[in-house]
């Protein structure tokens, strides 16, 4: 599940973290 709650730049890091 991916969380795009962060900024566009941090969104990429968030996706890997949400894994």
Curated annotation (Swiss-Prot):
Going by the entry's taxonomy, the superkingdom of the source organism is recorded as: Eukaryota
As for subcellular location, the record says: Secreted
Keyword Isomerase in annotation: no
User: Which is one Gene Ontology cellular component term of this protein?
Assistant: extracellular region
Cysteines paired by S-S bonds: none
Q: How is it modified after translation?
A: Conversion of fibrinogen to fibrin is triggered by thrombin, which cleaves fibrinopeptides A and B from alpha and beta chains, and thus exposes the N-terminal polymerization sites responsible for the formation of the soft clot.
The answer on whether this UniProt entry bears the keyword Secreted reads: yes
What is annotated about its quaternary structure and interactions?
Answer: Heterohexamer; disulfide linked. Contains 2 sets of 3 non-identical chains (alpha, beta and gamma). The 2 heterotrimers are in head to head conformation with the N-termini in a small central domain.
- What is the name of the protein in this document? Fibrinogen beta chain
């Amino acid at each position: 599940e991916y969380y795009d709650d962060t900024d566009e730049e941090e969104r990429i890091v968030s996706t890997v973290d949400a894994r």
